[in-house]
Amino acid sequence: MELLKELTNTFGAEIIILPWDTNEIYGHTDGIVRFIDDDSVLMTNYAQFDPAMATRFRRILQTHFKKVYELSFKAAKPHKYSWAYINWLQTDKVLILPKFVIPEDQEAYEQISKLMLQYRNRIEMVDASDLIRYEGGLNCASWTIYVTPNQDQP
């Protein structure tokens, strides 16, 4: 508990612990859930792959957020990469969604666009087919650095 308190103080945010799905090699939450706003998060389509694990995640998230949205796709058996839309790259100016040239691309774009209203007309899709083959998404392959306005940059 001391570690959680220290993390909360350091980051100035509530720390939420999700269980590690032992079927996943890395266990990173950027492949499971994304922050939408103070009241809501978006979960990937975990329920279409592992309903029991999705329920565990959902129950934990519902104790911290008023709304837990979930991606879902019409395909009876979603493509094996469809979980990775949640692993988008987000900047202050644009949200970059991965695409995999599969039927779920458009569905993911529409669902995420409806939730990420602050990015209206500023959501782009980039082919991440090669990247996902190596078990990573756009967020995995990036590094977030906050630069304060007017700060000298290297």
Roles of regions detected by a PLM:
Residues 1-154:
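Histidine/cysteine-enriched polar flanking segments
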